[in-house]
Amino acid sequence: MKLSLSPPPYADAPVVVLISGLGGSGSYWLPQLAVLEQEYQVVCYDQRGTGNNPDTLAEDYSIAQMAAELHQALVAAGIERYAVVGHALGALVGMQLALDYPASVTVLVSVNGWLRINAHTRRCFQVREQLLHSGGAQAWVEAQPLFLYPADWMAARAPRLEAEDALALAHFQGKNNLLRRLNALKRADFSRHADRIRCPVQIICASDDLLVPSACSSELHAALPDSQKMVMRYGGHACNVTDPETFNALLLNGLASLLHHREAAL
């Protein structure tokens, strides 16, 4: 699996791996790259079955497989210890990595994540699946911003959204791959295993997230032994895109604090 690695800013700089959500594209993290690359070696990638890692996914594709193939690719690139920043599905992959490779994951940052899918989130995905089946990729892509961004943010950026729709449609991961990745997301349940995650965790959520209620992050916080939670008052599901200044400050402060905390505990 192809990875994109930034040059380390100094010798032995910590590694931060960015894992996007259901869309799977590493470019999702563009608003974070410049600030992170000043302090860390940053790893981005298109998830298997998407972007520049095309593949046909098995029907039983799982979050555990997503975690295993990423860890193997990192080890092949010479990276054995790393912090993980995951958004939504990416946060699930991050938790799986922390469970399966505890010696490798130094810190986990969960952005609008959850223990198991909330009834409201499931309802949103049911509607989106119906759109996919009835209207195809175009209907899926055109509806997606409604679940990602605040209404006023979208209204002020209509030309940008039209351009993003065209790009997303041109690089659509395919109906079968999308549904198999979505099914993996819906099957994931960390409610019985979260207390085994021993690395420090930063939880970031947006109170106005339409897709994933912020209560899901509160449940995560209660279940994870060594976690801290930060709430953004504005930003929607893609809060790192809509309010990168606020998000980046939270992320940079959290990573610095938790990595120091981890080193001090060793």
From Swiss-Prot:
Cysteine disulfide partners in this protein: none
Keywords recorded for this protein, A-Z: Hydrolase
Catalytic activity: carbamate + 2 H(+) = NH4(+) + CO2
Molecular function GO terms recorded: hydrolase activity, acting on carbon-nitrogen (but not peptide) bonds, in linear amides
E.C. numbers: 3.5.1.-
Gene Ontology CC annotations of this record: membrane
Any one of the GO BP annotations: uracil catabolic process
Hydrolase among keywords: yes
InterPro entries: AB_hydrolase_1, AB_hydrolase_fold, AB_hydrolase_sf, Pyrimidine_utilisation_RutD
Top-level taxonomic group: Bacteria
Claim: Hydrolase is one of the keywords in the record: yes
Protein task: Involved in pyrimidine catabolism. May facilitate the hydrolysis of carbamate, a reaction that can also occur spontaneously.
UniProt family annotation: Belongs to the AB hydrolase superfamily. Hydrolase RutD family.
UniProt xrefs under HAMAP family: RutD
NCBIfam families membership: RutD
Protein name per the record: Putative carbamate hydrolase RutD
Naturally occurring in which organism (per UniProt): Escherichia coli O6:K15:H31 (strain 536 / UPEC)
Encoding gene per record: rutD
